[in-house]
A protein has these predicted regions:
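Venus flytrap/periplasmic-binding-protein-like
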Residues: 47-50, 91-115, 128, 175-184
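Solvent-exposed, acidic/polar segments of extracytosolic/periplasmic ligand-binding ectodomains
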Residues: 182, 186-249
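Cofactor-binding loop segments of dinucleotide-utilizing enzymes, especially the Rossmann-like FAD-
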Residues: 16, 101, 123, 210
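Extracellular/periplasmic ligand-binding modules, especially the Venus flytrap/periplasmic-binding
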Residues: 76-81, 127-183, 199-200
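Extracellular/periplasmic Venus flytrap/periplasmic-binding protein
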Residues: 1-89, 124-134
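Beta->alpha turn/N-cap motifs
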Residues: 73-76, 98-103, 121-122
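Extracellular/periplasmic catalytic domains that process cell-envelope and extracellular macromolecules
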Residues: 5-6, 63-65, 88-91, 111-114, ...
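Structural signal for hydrophobic
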Residues: 11, 117-120, 139
Length: 249
C-alpha cells in the first residue's frame, strides 16, 4: 500500500522488543527496500515489551527525525500509549501504519485527534455486511463491547464444514478435512492452505475516521471507526511458505 503513496518519503519504525516486533522491523525494511528504494528509514526503535509508561521520548525522536510515516507492530498498552503521546504532542503531520489499532484500549486512545492519521492492515473492519454484521451488533447489545476478532467467525464456519466432510469429530480426521478447504466468509473466499494450515484471505487497509451513515458501527463508543480504503484479494495478500509440516500418522 505504501509503495503507491508518493508522499511517503521518510519512515520511522517503532516496535516491541520481542520476536514479533523484531520481525515487523526486519520485514518492513526488506519490503521498503524492494518496493520503494527511495524511502529513507529515519529511525528503528525496539521498546521493551509492556514496560514503557510514557512514549513522549519516542515521539520526540520521531518528530526530530522528520518522519512522515510510522510503521508499528505495537499492541496493547504499547500502542495505546504511543498514540496518546503522539496526540498529546500534536504530531499531526505523521501517519501511523498499524496492525492492532482496533484491539481493546487502542480506539479510546486514538479518539478524534487521530482521525485520518492512523491506518490498520487486517482481514476485517467493523462494518461488514451480511451475517457477521448481526453478530457484531448483537455482541455489542449484550456485552457493551466490540467483537473485533472476526477470526472467530472463520473458525466456527470452518469447523462446522470440517465436521460434515469428515463425518466425524475425531481431531485427526477433522484436521485432515480442513486441509485445502475453501469457504465463503465475511471477507470473501478463505482457504486453509494445506502446506502450513495458514488461512489465506483478503486483507483490508483501513483508516481511522468519524463514523457515518455508510460506516455506522464505531469502536469503543468513540464515534470513530476504521473505514476500508483498499482491499487486497487473497492471491495478492498471500505469501510463500517454507513449512515442512509433520502430520500425525
Amino acid at each position: 500500500y505504501m509503495k503507491d503513496l508518493p508522499e511517503v518519503k521518510k519512515v520511522y519504525l517503532i516496535n516491541q522488543n520481542y520476536s514479533h516486533g523484531q520481525q515487523v522491523s526486519k520485514y518492513a525494511k526488506e519490503m521498503l527496500k524492494r518496493k520503494r528504494a527511495d524511502v529513507e528509514i529515519v529511525g528503528d526503535d525496539l521498546a521493551p515489551l509492556a514496560q514503557v509508561r510514557d512514549f513522549a521520548p519516542y515521539i520526540a525522536k520521531i518528530k526530530q527525525s522528520g518522519a512522515d510515516s510510522v510503521i508499528t507492530g505495537n499492541w496493547g498498552s504499547d500502542l495505546a500509549l504511543l498514540i496518546k503521546a503522539a496526540n498529546d504532542a500534536g504530531l499531526n503531520n505523521v501517519k501511523f501504519y498499524t496492525y492492532y489499532a482496533v484491539a481493546t484500549g487502542a480506539p479510546t486512545a486514538l479518539g478524534a485527534a487521530a482521525a485520518g492519521k492512523v491506518y490498520m492492515v487486517g482481514y476485517s473492519h467493523p462494518n461488514h455486511e451480511g451475517p457477521i454484521n448481526a453478530i457484531v451488533r448483537g455482541f455489542k447489545a449484550r456485552f457493551n463491547d466490540d467483537m473485533y476478532t472476526g477470526s472467530v467467525y472463520h473458525g466456527f464456519s470452518m469447523l462446522t464444514e470440517a465436521f460434515q466432510r469428515a463425518k466425524s469429530t475425531d481431531p485427526v480426521k477433522v484436521a485432515a478435512a480442513m486441509e485445502g478447504m475453501k469457504f465463503k466468509s465475511f471477507n470473501g473466499e478463505v482457504e486453509m492452505r494445506k502446506a502450513d494450515h495458514q488461512l489465506q484471505q483478503g486483507l483490508y487497509i483501513t483508516r481511522w475516521e468519524k463514523a457515518d451513515a455508510k460506516h455506522p458501527l464505531d469502536a469503543e463508543n468513540t464515534g470513530h471507526t476504521f473505514v476500508p480504503v483498499k482491499y487486497y484479494e487473497p492471491y495478492v495478500a498471500s505469501t510463500p511458505t517454507s513449512c515442512q509440516m509433520k502430520r500425525p500418522s
